[in-house]
């Protein structure tokens, strides 16, 4: 694992500290978020993607609410 000094050294090597400050890390997180979104949309685990499961669960919840209201 990394020690605190090693992490600090790595973070200090990221350019733009004086001009952008802490915001110099934003592009990394933007790319990371985009990659996660792409994986959730495109990568199939078994036969389903994350959004397939989400849509199915939302539909099941809506159906259960209708049954409870009747």
From Swiss-Prot:
One of its GO terms (cellular component) is mitochondrial inner membrane. GO terms for molecular function: mitochondrial ribosome binding. The keyword Heme does not apply. The chain crosses the membrane at residues 20-41. Keywords: Membrane, Mitochondrion, Mitochondrion inner membrane, Transmembrane, Transmembrane helix. It is a single-pass membrane protein. Residues 42-70 are mitochondrial intermembrane. It is found in: Mitochondrion inner membrane. Residues 1-19 are mitochondrial matrix. The keyword Membrane applies. GO terms for biological process: mitochondrial cytochrome c oxidase assembly; mitochondrial respiratory chain complex III assembly. InterPro entries: UQCC5. Required for the assembly and stability of the mitochondrial ubiquinol-cytochrome c reductase complex (complex III (CIII) or cytochrome b-c1 complex), a multisubunit transmembrane complex that is part of the mitochondrial electron transport chain (ETC) which drives oxidative phosphorylation. Mediates early complex III biogenesis. Participates in regulating the levels of electron transport chain proteins, and therefore energy supply, in response to changes in energy demand. Also involved in the first steps of cytochrome c oxidase complex (complex IV) assembly. Belongs to the UQCC5 family. Associates with the mitochondrial ribosome. Interacts with UQCC6. Interacts with MT-CYB; interacts with newly synthesizes MT-CYB. Forms a complex, named COMB/coordinator of mitochondrial CYTB biogenesis, composed of UQCC1, UQCC2, UQCC4, UQCC5 and UQCC6; regulates MT-CYB synthesis and promotes its membrane insertion. This is Ubiquinol-cytochrome c reductase complex assembly factor 5.
């Amino acid at each position: 694992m990394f020690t605190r000094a090693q992490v600090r050294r790595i973070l200090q090597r990221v350019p733009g500290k004086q001009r952008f400050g802490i915001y110099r890390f934003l592009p990394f997180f933007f790319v990371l978020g985009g990659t996660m979104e792409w994986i959730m949309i495109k990568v199939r685990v078994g036969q389903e993607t994350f959004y397939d499961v989400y849509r199915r669960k939302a539909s099941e919840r809506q159906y259960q609410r209708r049954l409870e209201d009747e």
